[in-house]
């Protein structure tokens, strides 16, 4: 069927900020979809609130709106643009929920707008637990016994009838939010109460638990002519009971017989046809390991995390084809872009194994609840491809960047057997490493299977890895053992450890025997047809399919998995860098390990290597491709950390040189550089042990800011008030980086701002200064940032520009650089310099219109700012006000304190832009879901050092009609100053303590600060977590509360008696 001519203008709804459960896979899907629709000649209008994505670049759609994804704003854009149709299935759960809201509000009917892709009835049938159950019964598809409840009592009655354990699944939530497995009535009450609150329709499904079954996923496509196919089937390493986003996953399925595979395939196709989905869909099934019994778990009627994985695993571009199906094209008339000859109707076949391992944030959140269940906790994921399961698993392990090069954590060799068994049974994010340790200690795989319900096939593969380790121990320097270890994915580093040698010795031994990896092509058809894609993975076999090009090439290193501190912003910079390399006439090669992102879409670069970002894997690609040089500036800390080793191996690092990167990262060299350049910084010292640190703090004076050198996202950074706290910090935190010392700095409590600059070594372009709303002490990634600055005098801005210029030239910076400043008493100090692209690059590029990563790349390749038509110095400011606001995922992470501090905690960001600061702030707060009512009750619980400042805020809240409530000490202080506040009880006073008031909906906002000492106050944490659970706006920095107040005041009319 040809594409539709009756629609011209299509609106695509994006997925908003990155949160746990909805990450960069939707940037990838949305980008693909917009480009596909433009390719077919439609006019595309995009709405998304996330500035950090490629998707919100001007060239991706005909018109791009970076506005809050709320009914109020989307409605206004629709009325302004009048699209003929809306495509909501590429914006994750956010897009689907927005489509439902637009429909319920009557907006779609009113303006005669059609929904493309999946009809509302199908979304409803798949998402509404009751309708889904009815449909499955009609289709004769088995689902676990279940009931729909709207109250906790109904849940308890049902569970008493069928027995525990049961699973709670709230309707219309994302990433299993609010759900869980309950083994007792007490757990059931707690989880159901929370789940009903989080479900927008106050509805939960309570079902018999089938934990322990195999979890299988089918990624299916269907078009309007009822053609349907399976793109990819995947099998979870972990059995049912752990969210698929938190499971290790293999593609294709590994343990199913042909009969089982056909049975589940038929079920998946039957379901997508019954739902009449046009586009992509993901079906999750549970299979009994001991019989042919299976259950349908759930259906996602949209492009999902699994479809991004399936696209990258097979090379089949699901989102692109789904967008074309939505406008009427059929699978049998679209060419598969990988082969260029076969049609999209042809099911992909794989002659390799793909492994996906999730990346968790627990290196940042040491106190977080690490046990896995039906609620997702991972921030990102890595994928690796190999010719056997062991190879793909080990490549994925070393892609994680958690300090391991193998499925082994050396620290586990010291734990007791008892702890080992507990960790094997109760799955945490690192269970794979505990399982491998158990096998090394001689536990049989049969024992482990009965404890974990993980299939023997997978455990046998872990055993095989251990057997190869033992073989290597017995045969040191043995060539055949080395070849075998390499064939099964062992890294040089691991083999060197076993043989007690240096990694370079193993590399030399390999080279002397010409033992190099070959690169195989991902071609969707198991080499049955010629493929045209330059998409490769390494393996140790005979035939190499990647041919070095005759054109000069440049290798760009990506940023690996998404984690807190290193998000999609770095992928944005990578993709832009590639565009600039191609424009300059070179071949652009990307190397990355993240399946969710745009950079690993094979159509972005001239060649894509899907490989771990380790020295060995990068060198192997360099040995084959012989690029002119490597760019490390855009891959975050991941790429920067490889620069030294690559440079020592004789690789040309383009842009800022390694010794200059070192001058910015190494404390003593940096201090020396600042002194020479005449730039002030907070007084500080380096310490390698406890005595030195105490000596430094004594000399500088408390409070001090302590942190390890060479880290990203403020990991293990703390503000310390006294000697005791400092000793405790050193004893617990220095393990963050043993070979690097810790830095002890004077802590300056002033205004923070940051600058991204682009330098060619002689001139420096400063696109803009971003002023932070929160004062120093809150990590820059967690602060709200304003551009252009609202409270910095012209003189201070000139000083900042001057210091930035001196730094860029003094550090021989070529390309990007980020500098953070703190201002106190009109004095500007430099806090830190990062000689690379930072997380603010996409935001600043969008608000200034300067394609920063592209310009930086051109400078790295030898052009000057003058050649490109840019002046030296600070770029003229924008007329609008733009706010970048952080977005957190605390609802997904139990036991993580939401108090903001020097360690980064946000997972994503949104942007608000308008003609005034107040309007821009309003949009930013709406976009990050901090909606505050015009009046109500606000609770203040304030540390002594901020009470005076909090008092003026409380007075302003009262003036606009809020009732002030406060805890004992704060209320007493307010009363002394003439402001009366309602007293709230201490934690534990059942009737009116803050958590109780919050639970009953009596509180509209909470302002809670702690002293500089930031002791882990249990009460404060309970208050904060109750606010997070109930979705009550919580301010842990007075500056954020002040910003919110500015918005409320601007929306209030003045009411005075005459």
UniProtKB/Swiss-Prot annotation:
It catalyses: hydrogencarbonate + L-glutamine + 2 ATP + H2O = carbamoyl phosphate + L-glutamate + 2 ADP + phosphate + 2 H(+). Mn(2+) 2 binds at residues 298, 300. Belongs to the CarB family. Mn(2+) 1 binds at residues 284, 298. This is Carbamoyl phosphate synthase large chain. Its EC number is 6.3.4.16, 6.3.5.5. Its cofactor is Mg(2+); Mn(2+). Mg(2+) 1 binds at residues 284, 298. SMART domains: CPSase_L_D3, GARS_A, MGS.
